[in-house]
């Protein structure tokens, strides 16, 4: 006997940032929405990614503050870490946010089903596992938002003790004395920075010629200098071939081609994420999936199958960022509503990396702009001359602006804004607006920044690009 079906306007498979954002946005537009999630609403970002990772980075920031208290005339004992307390605080933050999200979904009348959703026929999703296994929902519009999981490398099989990914790391009950972070991208640098601040001897092992390969070269240089000063070792252009567990079982030797093995207590694998698309869609439906497992979608997030959209980490060729998933979710819902949405401009999305010092950027790097044919003008301003940075005792970093040279030879359209330094992840908003509104340097330079503030460095950089500087020449 076929299962009884329930009808909705939209059915979403996946309850992470892309899925729940689509659910909330669709429900606020008056659509009836069902969302199927196999674990907890909030997905990787809330439970095993953005939120818990930043909680531990905040623990590291508190450590740094206490360690430098004497500089401000405040007497404090040398800091010690009770990691169990840090874990408990992380979990309380996650639980509180999960409860809030669950409440918002309920208030918007979103039907949340627990289990693994599978698109079994056009417009029909069946729950195949979990509490609601066997239930069937139908809708004219289906959104695939099943997310991703950490990738691993051959020879680095995850055991949850000596070899971990972000999933296992964020649930550890203790920190190692030494660690190799395999992968020097955003997540790898965040883990390396946090571990180093908390007293762990860290080595970043990166396969590419540089860490943070997606960042502007001046940003990479600044972070590399900072990490070296903090004794974070970096091995680049590395080929990892495996590891050999020590006889005691408490350490392992990471094998790197052409180099001596690196003995550490833990290997943290941070080499990107793979999409969760296996078994999500019946092949006969016609959703195109590329050879890496990603779903192919157009600018409106439509897949090759009529009535099926995809958002978030599963989408081919897009940044795997929660805020990008939010934006894609809104595009998909607007398209379902027939509102002619503006596609996400992936070259201009904001990026935030929460290592110390922080990194934030939007738009083109200098190298990208030149490669695309622009005649560029750039300007850099260090935080060392910023009064607010001096006050808080955090002066590492700089702001760099990349602009197109106008017909008069002066800096014209703002192409990219790149920041390294204190709280730059909170400062990027003005730079992001400048890039996305295709603002001219003269226009942005006319905006007044409060004094004393960290954001003055962004303002001063823009003023200097006009050809007349204040504190910056």
Predicted regions and their residues:
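Short hydrophobic core segments
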Residues: 11-13, 117, 136-147, 182, ...
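FAD-site-proximal beta/loop scaffold in flavoenzymes
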Residues: 159-176, 261-338, 430
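A Rossmann-like FAD-binding core segment of flavoenzymes
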Residues: 111-114, 118-129, 198-299, 364, ...
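Flexible, glycine-rich terminal cap/loop adjacent to redox cofactors
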Residues: 11-18, 22, 27-39, 44, ...
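Beta1/beta-strand and adjacent pyrophosphate-binding region of the FAD-binding site
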Residues: 4-16, 175-185
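Rossmann-like NAD(P)H-binding beta-loop-alpha module
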Residues: 173-215
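A conserved FAD-binding loop/helix module that cradles the flavin
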Residues: 218, 222, 311-368, 451-473
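Glycine-rich flavin
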Residues: 2-8, 24-31, 36-175, 203, ...
């Amino acid at each position: 006997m076929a299962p009884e079906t329930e009808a909705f306007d939209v059915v979403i498979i996946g309850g992470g940032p892309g899925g729940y954002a689509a659910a909330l946005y669709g429900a606020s537009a008056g659509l009836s929405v069902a969302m199927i999630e196999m674990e907890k609403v909030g997905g990787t970002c809330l439970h095993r990614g953005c939120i818990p990772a930043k909680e531990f980075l905040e623990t590291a920031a508190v450590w740094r503050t206490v360690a430098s208290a004497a500089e401000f005339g405040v007497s404090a004992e040398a800091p010690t870490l009770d990691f169990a307390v840090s874990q408990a605080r992380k979990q309380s933050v996650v639980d509180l946010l999960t409860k809030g999200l669950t409440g918002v979904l309920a208030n918007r009348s979103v039907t949340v089903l627990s289990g693994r959703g599978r698109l079994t026929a056009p417009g029909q999703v069946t729950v195949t596992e979990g509490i609601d296994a066997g239930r069937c929902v139908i809708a004219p519009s289906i959104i695939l938002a099943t997310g991703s999981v950490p990738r691993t490398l051959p020879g680095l099989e995850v055991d949850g003790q000596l070899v971990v990914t972000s999933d296992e790391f964020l649930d550890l009950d203790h920190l190692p004395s030494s660690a190799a972070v395999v992968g020097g991208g955003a997540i790898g640098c965040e883990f390396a920075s946090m571990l180093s601040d908390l007293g762990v001897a860290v080595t970043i092992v990166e396969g590419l010629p540089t860490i943070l390969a997606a960042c502007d070269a001046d940003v990479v240089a600044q972070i590399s200098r900072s990490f070296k000063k903090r004794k974070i070792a970096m091995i680049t252009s590395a080929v990892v071939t495996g590891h050999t567990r020590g006889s005691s079982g408490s350490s392992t030797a990471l094998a790197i081609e052409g180099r001596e093995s690196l003995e550490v207590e833990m290997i943290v694998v941070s080499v990107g994420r793979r999409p969760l698309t296996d078994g999500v869609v019946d092949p006969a439906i016609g959703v195109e999936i590329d050879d890496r497992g990603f779903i192919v979608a157009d600018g409106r997030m439509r897949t090759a199958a009529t009535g099926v959209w995809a958002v978030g980490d599963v989408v081919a060729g897009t940044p795997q960022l929660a805020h990008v998933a939010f934006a894609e979710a809104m595009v998909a819902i607007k398209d379902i509503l027939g509102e002619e949405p503006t596609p996400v401009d992936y070259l201009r999305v904001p990026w935030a990396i929460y290592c110390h010092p922080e990194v934030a950027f939007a738009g083109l790097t200098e190298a990208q702009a030149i490669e695309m044919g622009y005649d560029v003008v750039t300007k850099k301003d260090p935080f060392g001359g910023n009064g607010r940075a001096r006050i808080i005792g955090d002066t590492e970093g700089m702001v760099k602006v990349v602009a197109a040279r106008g017909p008069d030879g002066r800096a014209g359209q703002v192409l990219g804004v790149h920041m390294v330094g204190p709280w730059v992840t909170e400062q990027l908003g003005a730079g992001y607006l400048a890039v996305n509104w295709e603002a001219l340097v003269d226009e942005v330079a006319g905006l007044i920044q409060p004094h004393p503030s960290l954001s003055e460095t962004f303002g001063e950089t823009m003023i200097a690009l006009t050809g007349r500087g204040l504190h910056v020449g």
